[in-house]
Amino acid sequence: MDLTNRMMEPEEFARQRQEVLNQWATGRDVDFEEAVAYHKNLPRSKNFSYKLAEGKARGITFAQPRAGVALLNEHLELLRFLEEEGEADFLPTTIDSYTRQNRYAEAQTGIDESRLVGRSMLNGFPAVNHGVSACRRLIEHPKVPVQVRHGTPDARLLAEITLAGGFTAYEGGGISYNIPYAKDVSIEKSIKYWQYVDRLVGMYEEKGVSINREPFGPLTGTLVPPSVSHGVAVIEGILAVAQGVRSLTLGYGQCGNLLQDVAAIRTLPLLAAEYLSKLGYTDFDITTVFHQWMGGFPQDEAKAYGVISWGAAAAALGKATKVIVKSPHEALGIPTKEANAAGIRTTKQILNMLKDQSLPMTEELALEEKMIREETRAILDRTLDLGEGDMAVGAVRAFQAGVIDVPFAPSRYNGGRILPARDSQGAVRVLDFGNLPFSEEIKEFHRERIARRGRDEGREPSFQMVIDDIYAIGKGMLVGRPRS
């Protein structure tokens, strides 16, 4: 396997860079040294890493939406509205689907059509096509830091252009932006692509420019057991730090049970620090991001606000550094700027009300933390064993062996053998373990919790239970109970 978790050699980076910057005409505008100078002239208040570190030190949970449209002026207006009317602490630039698949000619067609019809014909901002100077306008106008959010297996050119354009945060990873998003991209290939991205971030760090990196925590966003998403997050964190990344934000997608969600967001940075230290890394700063519910939403706006508020409460009580906000129009498609801003304000109201409160440690919360730690360590230890100490090699082999298995992912490189289901209290458990490397004690815990739900509902745990859980929140509940 032509893959290793060592820092990319300068010669290899330079060889790839020449190829990457020639993938689209705007790549020729990238000048690394000039970009470093541009970053150093930006005010500290626009740097993502610094603001996250300040929030972590002060115990603040920040709110950030998702948003992106095709044309520059319209996207600028959208960001202005979300900052001023939504009171967003951080702003996004969500990238369109064509750019995510490196289909820049089709993205250009979308730009042209958007200009023609007077509205966005793309589901995001095509940053590669707009180029470095346009990206700098996006950074210069808002008062708060702006992040690139996308879903791209090969995000090398996008990273070159947006980082040269002044963005100070970049989402994604070789696993989290492949397995949930693509069908035919090998994990080995996407990890290599993202080693390039992380090395680029590391090069900025070496020049004194801090760029935040954020692996995508929720994965498929559908009943993903915390230990599975934690395993991927920690691996991607290790791969990033190996290339010189220092500011790392690890993510988790809300499952819905408050104790499990709080336990998950509390254990994630501790597990990451544990394994980074175990592998000899010392120069890193870990913050956390909590994603409000990523599954199906109620169509009723009032009910959608309820789901948003529950996610905000879990983020606040879990002491996440940042929460990614949903809109009350989630079930209907791309939200209006007004709906998006309303979701942020709803979230911030909850965050402000709960900022001085904490969830006391109870026997059940302690148990959830213990189970997440033990399960995640089982996955990570087996992954390291498979890679003979190399986490990049181990990650590829772990997916091949089913040691890491993401529920409901489209990728043919994912086993798809595990089945999750909720227990009686809505916590996500594992109904079918596939090849997850859990001890018999861990498996028995999951079996007992799901069996208890089966007894409560008068039915045998089965795939129908899983289906019921997938649709439950859209129908106004957390646990998919059978109709009485």
UniProtKB/Swiss-Prot annotation:
Superkingdom assignment: Bacteria
Binding site for adenosylcob(III)alamin: G68, N123, P180, F297, K326, E330, I334
Name this protein carries in UniProt: Glutamate mutase epsilon subunit
Cofactor(s) named in the record: adenosylcob(III)alamin
InterPro entries per UniProt: Cbl-dep_enz_cat (IPR016176), Glu_mut_E (IPR006396), Glu_mut_E_C_dom_sf (IPR014714)
UniProt record similarity statement: Belongs to the methylaspartate mutase GlmE subunit family.
Catalytic reaction(s) noted: (2S,3S)-3-methyl-L-aspartate = L-glutamate
